[in-house]
Amino acid sequence: METKQFKAESKRLLDLMINSIYTHKEIFLRELISNSSDAMDKIYYKTLTEDSLKFERDDYYIKVVFDKENRVLKIADTGIGMTKEELENNLGVIAKSGSLQFKKENEVKEGYDIIGQFGVGFYSAFLVSDDVTVISKAFGSNEAYKWNSKGAEGYTIEPCEKEAYGTEIILKIKDNTEEENYDEFLDEYTLKSIIKKYSDFIRYPIKMDLTKTKPKEDNKEEFEEYKEEETINSMVPIWRKNKNELKAEDYENFYAEKHYGFDKPIKYIHTSVDGVVSYNAILFIPETTPYDFYTKEYEKGLELYSSGVLIMNKCGDLLPDYFGFVKGIVDSEDLSLNISREILQHDRQLKLIAKNIKTKIKNELESLLKKERDKYEKFYESFGRQLKYGVYSDFGSNKDILQDLLMFYSSKEKKMVTLAEYVSRMPEDQKYIYYAVGESNERIEKLPQIEGVLDKGYEVLYFTDDIDEFAIKMLMNYKEKEFKSVSSGDLGIEGEEKENTSSSDDKENKELFESMKDILSGKVKDVRASKRLKNHPVCLANEGELSIEMEKVLNAMPNNQNIKADKVLEININHDVFKPLKEAYEGDKEKLKLYTDLLYNQALLIEGLTINDPVEFTNNICKIMK
């Protein structure tokens, strides 16, 4: 028996494949099962092209057998098998694909899918074995052959006995090392799990003898083990079934089986696309957020299959971050994979799929908002913040996609409303979309700054998430209506009462306000008469793009730079406090400082900002009570 050498820079290339191409050792089982599936596909194709042949599906299956004691794992199939020449050409030449050659020779048309195209999948067996044997008998042949290799040094081929056509791959599993536990590939549960993970949707049965227990015949209280053959894989994936055959329960069961969440999905999306790139997908919109969703540990992505074989557990490139909550799978035969089937070679197809999926999710969410408002609001409660992050991120490049999905609490409706709904009922004289920022709806309703806008009869949107105002600043406008904070220096409201709108108030009290500004030097940019206050004595407004609420958010972040908004102290000259304030200016400068500090600190407290000196503040209160 002659030992032959591999025909492709044997040792170096084989070492490269074992050590570099495959990142997970368990992949070997996926590759060998995929090869077995290809072998049966080849017979199926022959029956389509040769009238004399018939294909009985029950005759075709894959059997996985393990022998823990002798450290042997066997993968057998009833596929087309290989002749001596094919064994030498396909297994003796690393990186030559018998499946690819079969496709070329038989001019395989579209719709007939063979998984293996690279000719290296078989060699993944050397990840877990240093003694690999292949026994094969070709379809229509009377001769069988045994191929054996112990690594890169070469291989042998010799005649052997085998009754039925097909192929058996026998692996002598390596001994454990300090770094690797090879025993797991001789464990029933592990093997079953790997098959379910990677090869669940191979279209032929993958069988194993599984350990069961039953009561002993002579003693029903004691149990004994026995073996029973079972089919491990599902074979027909749900996403390849006709949608009309499936019920909501089928999708919910699939969602649960995949451990996508403990709840039921709010929405499932089943789509099949044929075109430049063809794919099937089932997507789920969960009801509640995963516990780690808003943390760095959360990993977005869809399961990616190529021809029913799992390629990636979480393909993040298929989802934009703002739709990172979506769960599901994508299966395509058009992906350009590298030779390990683990990494995409070119991402053009993936980008096309991702673009289609993004549009599909957006359309489905808009449909949910329009037709099932209660469900959408439940979804938005869980994932609305992520949509707003999407508007803010990437310099607002996604705002046009997401703006119609946003919702905010309305002062008028006392419920969540969309921007479109807000704009549709704006009075003709209203120039801006008004919003107020606070920790809660209740806190916002008590803000002094909101009085003037509400008194005018305008609707105000309540922003209670840290991200809200940042997102709106990036959005800038909606349907040509700009956003305006109720805390802005200029509210842009026409027709205020004359005494409030006239600039004469500031002129009349110019010296008083200048004195107060000097007292608060470095704390406020200006002091002036308020045009917005009705019942409250004082408030803080801001000028410029950075609001007081944004200041609070930014300064709460790690490594903050003590960012400050430009603040303006506004005084309600019609409030009872203004008279003693003016009297103090005219006759008691110490009292003016006392009153000014009190009013400023009061405004800080209303905004939820920290008072610089709480002791001084309480002492000042005591002084005015004496």
Curated annotation (Swiss-Prot):
<feature type="region of interest" description="A; substrate-binding">
    <location>
        <begin position="1"/>
        <end position="341"/>
    </location>
</feature>
<dbReference type="GO" id="GO:0051082">
    <property type="term" value="F:unfolded protein binding"/>
</dbReference>
<keyword id="KW-0143">Chaperone</keyword>
<dbReference type="GO" id="GO:0140662">
    <property type="term" value="F:ATP-dependent protein folding chaperone"/>
</dbReference>
<dbReference type="InterPro" id="IPR001404">
    <property type="entry name" value="Hsp90_fam"/>
</dbReference>
<keyword id="KW-0547">Nucleotide-binding</keyword>
<dbReference type="Pfam" id="PF13589">
    <property type="entry name" value="HATPase_c_3"/>
</dbReference>
<dbReference type="GO" id="GO:0005524">
    <property type="term" value="F:ATP binding"/>
</dbReference>
<comment type="similarity">
    <text>Belongs to the heat shock protein 90 family.</text>
</comment>
<keyword id="KW-0067">ATP-binding</keyword>
<feature type="region of interest" description="Disordered">
    <location>
        <begin position="490"/>
        <end position="509"/>
    </location>
</feature>
<keyword id="KW-0346">Stress response</keyword>
<dbReference type="Pfam" id="PF00183">
    <property type="entry name" value="HSP90"/>
</dbReference>
<dbReference type="InterPro" id="IPR037196">
    <property type="entry name" value="HSP90_C"/>
</dbReference>
<feature type="region of interest" description="C">
    <location>
        <begin position="553"/>
        <end position="626"/>
    </location>
</feature>
<dbReference type="GO" id="GO:0016887">
    <property type="term" value="F:ATP hydrolysis activity"/>
</dbReference>
<keyword id="KW-0963">Cytoplasm</keyword>
<protein>
    <recommendedName>
        <fullName>Chaperone protein HtpG</fullName>
    </recommendedName>
</protein>
<feature type="region of interest" description="B">
    <location>
        <begin position="342"/>
        <end position="552"/>
    </location>
</feature>
<comment type="function">
    <text>Molecular chaperone. Has ATPase activity.</text>
</comment>
<feature type="compositionally biased region" description="Basic and acidic residues">
    <location>
        <begin position="498"/>
        <end position="509"/>
    </location>
</feature>
<comment type="subunit">
    <text>Homodimer.</text>
</comment>
<dbReference type="InterPro" id="IPR020568">
    <property type="entry name" value="Ribosomal_Su5_D2-typ_SF"/>
</dbReference>
<dbReference type="InterPro" id="IPR036890">
    <property type="entry name" value="HATPase_C_sf"/>
</dbReference>
<dbReference type="InterPro" id="IPR020575">
    <property type="entry name" value="Hsp90_N"/>
</dbReference>
<dbReference type="InterPro" id="IPR019805">
    <property type="entry name" value="Heat_shock_protein_90_CS"/>
</dbReference>
<dbReference type="GO" id="GO:0005737">
    <property type="term" value="C:cytoplasm"/>
</dbReference>
